[in-house]
Amino acid sequence: MTALAAVPDLQDAAGPSTTTVHSPNYSGSPADISSSPTTRAVSRNTARQTASAPPNHAESSPPGNASPTGPPSPSGNNVSPHGRHQGMSKLRACLVIATLSGVSFLNTMGSGILTVSLPTMARDVRLDDSLLLWPASVYSLAAGCTLLVFGAVGHIIGPKRVWITGACLYAAFTLGVGRSATGSQLIAFRSVLGVSIAMCLPTAVSLTTNGFGAGRWRNMAFAFQGMGQPLGYSTGLILGGIFTDTVGWRFGFYISGGINAVLAICALVVLPSPPRHDEGDGEQREVEEEATDATVAAAAVNRSSRSRPLISRLAHDVDWTGTLAISASMGFLSYVFSVVSKDYDRMAAPQNIALLVAAALLLPTFTLWVGRQERLDRPALIPNSLWRKAAFSSTCAAVFFTWAVFNAFQYFSALYFERIEHITALQTSLRFLPMVLVGAATNIVTGYLVETVEVRWLVVVSAIFSLFSPLIMALVRPGWGYWKGAFFAMLLSPLHPDVLFTVSNLIISRVYDGRSQSLAGAVFNAVSQVGNSVGLGLTAVVSSAVARSYHGSGGVGNAMDPPTGRPQHLPSSPTVEATLAGYHAAFWLMFGAAALVTVITFLGLRRGGKVGAVE
């Protein structure tokens, strides 16, 4: 909170500022709102029917979750040069950021508790060994399959409603996890938690961009949300280890659920309501004053769309076919790679092959469908024209590979500490503390630097530093000790992911117009979620294959057996060497992917500009 309160908030001494519309022009030059592909996809057919009609200002009453007394929209004189509403106090702005970042923190805190406590949890709820990893897997699967759905729904009914609903459900079912008496209850509650967090993650982007104008406050809001993830996971690891050995693992979920309930109540009061219907994204009104044909048509589209009943808008203003097609493809991919990460022999199972084929076929189907939607001027989830923008396409590719590497790096590092160095889960969690501290500092510094430093150099330099993390772990030997090897890998690993989190949210949110920010958040989170699953699955296949070939068929087992929370005294030195060889191979694969990210961002962000600067 202290760091947030220190954000400068200078008054605009030069008079009224000119605020332009978010656009895919990343160098910061102004662009008309009609340049947004998402706006164009919805506009022309409806505009033909409504542009000639006189404006009906009676239709501009606030929606259900809008408040006439809420903070003004981020336009013109209502926003300070650093992006904070002049009608919003610093305390309230800090509470908004803390609330949104808090759920991001609790999301990964639960995963950290689960990672350390899973063996004890499985014993207490009598979870079958064949289902041991399902409490973790179903959470990711449920979230990955519904992120885009709730991003689209939040675009229509309002991000604040969807976010608060998700936060309330997350609080309730986190407590449910703590009260689970059977394995089936544990898996079911974790599934609902995945759906609940899918309501919060994409809409948090919309609440951030609509709640803060372009500038330092928006940058810091994204930075603190990024900081919440590593802090939450590491806190979960530490608390999970402590609680499991003392008062019991259930206490960790009770604490998490209680904090979440407080955040949900706080959100009702402090979160900004969406702009009024006739204001669009809050920045459109200034553009409309220019009275160009395009902006008049866009305004007419907005009035016509908002005047229809909610059910009609949900039915016609959401690309349901595209949403379901890409969500199913991501769900199939995530499921198969989740299964394969536990036992790569299951890749040959007929049902997994069928799901992979279905996922592969759905991708070109989705591309053809959204292309058709664009040609017919209908809503398209991710218009194909966006992929022709180097900043957008390279950012999505970087997010995919970065989250694939970072997720796999954390998991394999934990395996290395427990299975090769034979230390406890609590000792393992303490070895991740440098990652947490550096990650927190990186997010705060990035929130300031995105205003003044070219995004290309921020991302590329951080990628080069983080490149050394998997390289060190690919070479490390148990005899090195923690301080000569793994310590430096932990220090460097969060630099690039935490820089990219802030930068990518700023870039992707600029591609979508202000009314579609929930979709922007859904795109980012969906890409990162698939990256998590694919990265862990592929590294698991490589690790297990190398371990088996190293030791023949004589007893290595699966190199991806999950941490048990206890020291793993392996039966023989050859087995340890085989397992270590598998881990090294996985880290080499991560190194290759991280190097690819460096090249992608260097080439793709040449015209990235300063994405955090006030336009």
UniProtKB/Swiss-Prot annotation:
Keywords linked to the UniProt accession: Glycoprotein, Membrane, Transmembrane, Transmembrane helix, Transport
TM region positions: 94-114, 138-158, 162-182, 192-212, 222-242, 251-271, 320-340, 351-371, 397-417, 432-452, 455-475, 488-508, 522-542, 585-605
Membrane-protein topology: Multi-pass membrane protein
Main location: membrane
Tagged with keyword Nucleotide-binding: no
Cellular-component GO terms for this entry: membrane
Pfam families, sorted: MFS_1
Ranges where the record places region Disordered: 1-85
Keyword Transmembrane helix: yes
Family according to the record: Belongs to the major facilitator superfamily. EmrB family.
Name the UniProt record assigns to this protein: MFS-type transporter 1
Organism of origin: Pyricularia oryzae (strain 70-15 / ATCC MYA-4617 / FGSC 8958) (Rice blast fungus)
Name of the gene this protein is made from: MFS1
